[in-house]
Amino acid sequence: MLILLPPSETKTPGGAGAPLDLPSLSFPELTDVRESIITDLGALSPDDALPVLGISEKLRPEAVANTVLRSAPTMPAVLRYSGVLYDALAADTLTPAALNRLAIGSALFGVVRAGDHIPHYRLSGGTKLPGAQGTTPTMKARWGTTITDALAGVDELIIDLRSGTYQQLGKVPGAVTVRVESVLGDGTRKVVSHFNKHYKGELARVLATSPREATTAGEVADIARGAGMTVEINEGRKETLTLVV
């Protein structure tokens, strides 16, 4: 199984890896789009990049980082991203076999494997990045069907834990998706928003470290239940699971 995670706006700076080597990244069919985005992103001066990226002057170093993407040090993608989901995942304690089950969606790289080395950058899935001839295409338009096509070549079950914005960059027909809901005092359900990433990080860790290999949504649910989680299979949408917290 391949567990597809969302990226994080917060990232670990620095790195000890060699500069970005696009041809070495997983899913090489995404290289051309990656190349064009890196070129357009690097062409923006920090002053111009701030409003495009939707960040304040306080985050100017993020915009500066985008100008040195080809020469900056790198680190494994799963360690580059930080924040709530990645804290719960605790990737630095995972075995190579567990890490091999993880991939990460992003606006800059489309999809990478956990061990792919990437630099520090700033770019979200909702950004409209100026391109050639004065156009400002959305990230969805830039990626088109390339992410979907690349993931169609994966011959194992995909568990898509990306947020809606990143799912829109490349939908995966047949993938297992997960909703996180909490039970209120009166017994009704509420979709979890604030801690959604935390619980998905916990689920990703459970799945990545499982000795079992899931091939169906039901088997994903069984693995999670075996770890003490409450998971339901939605009637009528067998690929959609609900994690109840």
From Swiss-Prot:
Residues 1-20 are annotated as: Disordered. InterPro entries: YaaA. One of its GO terms (biological process) is response to hydroperoxide. It holds the Pfam family H2O2_YaaD. One of its GO terms (cellular component) is cytosol. Belongs to the UPF0246 family. This is UPF0246 protein CE1889. It comes from Corynebacterium efficiens (strain DSM 44549 / YS-314 / AJ 12310 / JCM 11189 / NBRC 100395).
